[in-house]
Amino acid sequence: MCTYATVITPLDGSAKGPGGSWFHVTNGVVYFDHPVHAMAEHTLNIDFAVPSAGPAARVAVELTAASARDLIAAITQALDSAPAAMTG
């Protein structure tokens, strides 16, 4: 593996896991590396997780660099469209 940096950030949200059950997400783990499933040489990988519940309590996403940048732009656009008082 050739992970360049692993960035862990606290999160407060929910994720829908396998079987359709929802769980509280407390951590985001972001890193650029070889994917497990995506058909690309390298991907930006994001794990939405709750470490205290074990390794199964996570949703993993593998995105191409272009898709990751598009997602960043979409998140920024969505947040910017809401009133500042709502987004802090």
Model-derived segments and their meaning:
Residues 1-88:
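Positively charged, low-complexity terminal tracts
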